[in-house]
Amino acid sequence: MKISRETLHQLIENKLCQAGLKREHAATVAEVLVYADARGIHSHGAVRVEYYAERISKGGTNREPEFRLEETGPCSAILHADNAAGQVAAKMGMEHAIKTAQQNGVAVVGISRMGHSGAISYFVQQAARAGLIGISMCQSDPMVVPFGGAEIYYGTNPLAFAAPGEGDEILTFDMATTVQAWGKVLDARSRNMSIPDTWAVDKNGAPTTDPFAVHALLPAAGPKGYGLMMMIDVLSGVLLGLPFGRQVSSMYDDLHAGRNLGQLHVVINPNFFSSSELFRQHLSQTMRELNAITPAPGFNQVYYPGQDQDIKQRQAAVEGIEIVDDIYQYLISDALYNTSYETKNPFAQ
């Protein structure tokens, strides 16, 4: 079924307020979740609300966080987020990074002790809309076997990038460092669909197509994805003095406790390196040239990274956002959550 962006936003916001989140914070979380669903990233959209509601109601997401911004240098800062909702903390951290980069050319802002922040391309697009280049990366709970390994160590540790072209054009790139994000498995479960056997392994280490049998995810491109997730864990965890590797908290164990996750934003002002106008012209030229490339057999069009999601987002603004009926029924119900997510860590060793 399809519903309007405004309706979905209000339903999510109301449910999170029902769980105890203040209206301002609930609106921000809803904004990021609706953004994800509108772009077809259903793994990071409304499917997450029931889990968020349970964690908020049990105190694992701080309803009254005390944010503290520590400016550690002219271009660097740490936002101590007090286990606030991750979307709220990440958006706030990016706002500071944008101001710093506008003045000083570059900014590096770490967000320390936060919750799950959802689709992190939302935050790099904040920078791009301000005419800046945005890069963001964050930790995730352990659910991935390292290349060549049989035990879980790292999370999906996503990485996102966005840069402005001419007008309102934005080039966006957002990826998990696994073949697919855990949320894609959750989405497959909600739709009763199988998954490709290249995404994950079962408890015996064998490839599986059953999303309910997933025990561990696989790194993207083997050793390359493994190296990227290691780098992201270092920059968003070790660098900020936070738990790292398999010490990162599980999304599903003890929903009464804060996640203590880390995220790192890097923002670059093109005007400090060349000309913002020239940069934007060349980026738009890149996008047009990629679209003009002859497609390979089996493809109708070459898209630049993120273009397919841009198209879906524009369509959603007109046609509405696709949502699974079970999720819609939950959102309009009085239930805070139907099935507890606590202690259901599918990656427990």
Curated annotation (Swiss-Prot):
It is found in: Cytoplasm. The active site is at residue 116. NAD(+) binds at residues 140, 174-176, 224, 306-308. It is an enzyme of class 1 (oxidoreductase). GO terms for biological process: allantoin catabolic process; purine nucleobase metabolic process. Transmembrane segments: none annotated. It catalyses: (S)-ureidoglycolate + NAD(+) = N-carbamoyl-2-oxoglycine + NADH + H(+). Its main location: cytoplasm. Induction: By glyoxylate and allantoin under anaerobic conditions. Disulfide bonds: none annotated. The record marks 48 as: Plays a crucial role in stabilizing the binding of (S)-ureidoglycolate. InterPro entries: Mal/L-sulf/L-lact_DH-like_ah, Mal/L-sulf/L-lact_DH-like_NADP, Mal/L-sulfo/L-lacto_DH-like_sf, Malate/L-lactate_DH-like, Ureidoglycolate_dehydrogenase. Belongs to the LDH2/MDH2 oxidoreductase family. Homodimer. This is Ureidoglycolate dehydrogenase (NAD(+)). It comes from Escherichia coli O157:H7. The lineage of its organism: Bacteria, Pseudomonadati, Pseudomonadota, Gammaproteobacteria, Enterobacterales.
